Curated annotation (Swiss-Prot):
GO process terms (BP): lysosome organization; skeletal system development
Keywords assigned: Disulfide bond, Glycoprotein, Hydrolase, Lysosome, Membrane, Signal, Transmembrane, Transmembrane helix
Species assigned in the record: Pongo abelii
Taxonomic classification: Eukaryota, Metazoa, Chordata, Craniata, Vertebrata
Name recorded for this polypeptide: Lysosomal acid phosphatase
Lumenal side: 31-380
Active site, per annotation: H42, D287
CDD domains with a match to the protein in the record: HP_HAP_like
Entry annotated with the keyword Membrane: yes
Length: 423
């Protein structure tokens, strides 16, 4: 009986200690989403330009060139709906201005894409409906003039060092081989389109025009066969790599996509330390913006970002209290976003590792790094000019000294003959 009582006493004691621990020790904090940054491309649009022999000129498009279409509006409304579902429980179901901030480039198509996206993300309900027949509410989208945009409009410029890198890229074997392989093809396209300045760097415009026309049911010219379109598409992707890679990718990143990455890093750090930003920060921009950022992160898949594609950064606070970053890319509307892993880090990347690994592609002083360093030839010119300038200065000093002494000398005496003044 004593042993039995002793057993019950030990069991009771363990339960008591467990109860005390539950009361004294705080419960473990569950992993939680703290902050989201989105960068998306605008939706379907009309061509940004056409070519001289194109039978479909600007009047063929209801709003002209470079404008968001109804298809593009729907694409972004659907993306907004998908984001609403993904972040249910994180964002309020109704719009609260303290929770979200949206910035766009100053183009009609990106501004309108952001507005369509917000219509899907935050449909009005209850008191937010200003008209019972309209399931929409105005939500602010911020922008700056194109000439002042140093965050979302790429490639950034003017930047002499970047232009120098591009000239050096043109001399690489990869660029030279690509140019040689496609010389006759580019001549054919130039002849069919009427363009006189077609290069590896500009041929994407032809593909873009034909792609937009084909997407909207317009008949392509006979020369634009499926094989030609496929080849144009490949050259279009090459032009993106030319802008931000192929040669000195890390330095190009510091001058281009690293500028945006620097702001994203700053925001992630700020939210991990002070929580002073909105829960959701949205950037509405272009395919070049996405490629510039993904090349800086070294996660670019080599293909043009499709309409309404979206790069996602999610900041989590782990149950340990530390923070981690997860990235996703939504480039297909009927599939879940693809997980992206920063090279050298798992998909759930600790924030400190994310910051450390991306540090090399973030500029310290963009204006300074954009300057072209003086080469040996430039140094010789500078020295020669300095020597010439010094010699000229000495000659001027010598000349002034002589003139000064001549003026300081007293006037000489002149003998006058007797009677000279008496004629």
């Amino acid at each position: 009986m004593a042993g039995k009582r002793s057993g019950w006493s030990r069991a009771a004691l363990l339960q008591l200690l467990l109860g005390v621990n539950l009361v004294v020790m705080p419960p473990t904090q569950a992993r939680s989403l703290r902050f989201v940054t989105l960068l998306y491309r605008h939706g379907d649009r009309s061509p940004v330009k056409t070519y001289p022999k194109d039978p479909y000129q600007e009047e063929e498009w209801p709003q002209g060139f470079g404008q968001l279409t109804k298809e593009g509006m729907l694409q972004h409304w659907e993306l907004g709906q998908a984001l609403r579902q993904r972040y249910h429980g994180f964002l309020n179901t109704s719009y609260h201005r303290q929770e979200v901030y949206v910035r766009s480039t100053d183009f009609d198509r990106t501004l309108m894409s952001a507005e369509a996206n917000l219509a899907g993300l935050f449909p009005p309900n209850g008191m937010q409906r200003f008209n019972p027949n309209i399931s929409w509410q105005p939500i602010p989208v911020h922008t700056v003039p194109i000439t002042e945009d140093r965050l979302l409009k790429f490639p950034l410029g003017p930047c002499p060092r970047y232009e120098q890198l591009q000239n050096e890229t043109r001399q690489t074997p990869e660029y030279q081989n690509e140019s040689s392989r496609n010389a006759q093809f580019l001549d054919m396209v130039a002849n069919e389109t009427g363009l006189t300045d077609l290069t590896l760097e500009t041929v994407w415009n032809v593909y873009d025009t034909l792609f937009c026309e084909q997407t909207h049911g317009l008949r392509l010219p006979p020369w634009a066969s499926p094989q030609t379109m496929q080849r144009l598409s490949r050259l279009k992707d090459f032009s993106f790599r030319f802008l931000f890679g192929i040669y000195q990718q890390a330095e190009k990143a510091r001058l281009q996509g690293g500028v945006l990455l620097a702001q994203i890093r700053k925001n992630l750090t700020l939210m991990a330390t002070t929580s002073q930003l909105p829960k959701l920060l949205v950037y509405s921009a272009h395919d070049t913006t996405l490629v510039a950022l993904q090349m800086a992160l070294d996660v670019y898949n080599g293909e043009q970002a499709p309409y309404a594609s979206c790069h996602i950064f999610e900041l989590y606070q782990e149950d340990s209290g530390n923070f981690s970053v997860e990235m996703y890319f939504r480039n297909e509307s009927d599939k879940a976003p693809w997980p992206l892993s920063l090279p050298g880090c798992p998909h759930r990347c600790p924030l400190q590792d994310f910051l450390r690994l991306t540090e090399p592609v973030v500029p310290k002083d963009w204006q300074q790094e954009c300057q072209v360093a003086s080469g040996p030839a430039d140094t010789e010119v500078i020295v020669a000019l300095a020597v010439c300038g010094s010699i000229l200065f000495l000659l001027i000093v010598l000349l002034l000294t002589v003139l000064f002494r001549m003026q300081a000398q007293p006037p000489g005496y002149r003998h006058v003959a007797d009677g000279e003044d008496h004629a």
